[in-house]
Amino acid sequence: MSESILIARGVSKVFRGGGLEVPVLSGIDLAVQPGETVAIIGASGSGKSTLLHLLGGLDTPSAGSVTLMGRDFSALGEVDRGDWRNRHLGFVYQFHHLLAEFSALENVAMPLLIRRTERHAALAKAAEILTAVGLGHRLEHRPGELSGGERQRAAIARALVSDPSCLLADEPTGNLDSHTASVVFGLLIERVRQQQVSLIVVTHDQQLAAKADRVLNLNDGILCE
């Protein structure tokens, strides 16, 4: 089997405040293979988003470790961690977080421009992937001129434009009606498989989760098949 893209070993998280300790995650073990799609389901408040933040190096576990492309986040300084995360991970959230003053094309090109990719090349790559997600006719439209489903398509395109090793998606269709959610989720699965990108997606929708290669349940802080 190929080397895992992302590995969590014994990951636990305890929130502390006001003299109280609130355990959220306990002994999470997870290994995601290249090109694999993994769905994590669980009730609201079960810690799904917390787990995704830990897997993405956006937060530090109370115990255990998270390794991305062979490097342990805990062994990296803040700058190196950010660079490694930006190089290998893409993120999609329930809310699109597109910048209102920029077009869909400019929003999707933004990660490449931040990396100092030549502007013409960045815009060409953004146009290519927007076309692939069905927005080739909406390149110059701003977020306010797009439907909810179109905004999420643009957010997916932005997350994939820099060819990440793994995509982390937190309820990416949670703000959409059921029909649009099914279409957008199907598109997400299709794009990551075509680009051979690993995907970890958090969702409460079991029907959507069933489209992934593997479905895991998070219950009482424990992740299981």
From Swiss-Prot:
GO terms for biological process: lipoprotein localization to outer membrane; protein localization to outer membrane. It is found in: Cell inner membrane. One of its GO terms (cellular component) is plasma membrane. Its EC number is 7.6.2.-. GO terms for molecular function: ATP binding; ATP hydrolysis activity; transmembrane transporter activity. Pfam families: ABC_tran. InterPro entries: AAA+_ATPase, ABC_transporter-like_ATP-bd, ABC_transporter-like_CS, ABC_transpr_LolD-like, LolD_lipo_ATP-bd, MacB-like_ATP-bd, P-loop_NTPase. ATP binds at residues 42-49. Signal peptide: none annotated. Residues 6-225 form the ABC transporter domain. It is a peripheral membrane protein. The complex is composed of two ATP-binding proteins (LolD) and two transmembrane proteins (LolC and LolE). Part of the ABC transporter complex LolCDE involved in the translocation of mature outer membrane-directed lipoproteins, from the inner membrane to the periplasmic chaperone, LolA. Responsible for the formation of the LolA-lipoprotein complex in an ATP-dependent manner. This is Lipoprotein-releasing system ATP-binding protein LolD. It comes from Dechloromonas aromatica (strain RCB). The lineage of its organism: Bacteria, Pseudomonadati, Pseudomonadota, Betaproteobacteria, Rhodocyclales.
